[in-house]
Amino acid sequence: AVEVLRGVNMTVYPGKVTALVGDNGAGKTTLIKCLAGIYGLDGGAILWEGKEVNIPNPKAASALGIEFVYQDLALANNLDIVQNMFLGRERMSGPFLNEEAMEDLARETLAGLNVTTIKSIRQQVSSLSGGQRQSVAVAKAVMWNSKLVVLDEPTAALGVAQTAQVLALVRRLADRGLGVIIISH
């Protein structure tokens, strides 16, 4: 049998940014996919807030307060910012979408992260810059009372100014008391 991860021990603290750095093929993505509930563990344990937890699927990770911003951002270009932030988690008012509540929470979340470069929350995601798209993806992750946000290569395809903007956003997440993991090479 092939061992992919062995002897891994990582601690992430609230209010701190932890870097997960390694060469291609080192196991960074595999480790994070275990934390996301995409891959199961053959051995070892995941401790969450001091207790051993089983994370059998991504929904279980979200229920614990673990959210992910993947390198491709997982945003739908044909939808606007609000639609992307609530995709799969839409707010309802009876049988109808509660657009007003979703707009309010999206606006509040972006403002809370000090995202000021977006003109309208009803703007199509396809019209956003790389830094703005990254900000929307991060806001989507923190909107659900997350405790830990994992960012996979958050500045990979960004220019200098956009990189500075995203790193400032990451710092604000930690300042709000969230644990943050940044995956990088």
Where does each model-flagged region fall?
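Glycine-rich phosphate-binding loops of nucleotide-dependent enzymes
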Residues: A1-H185
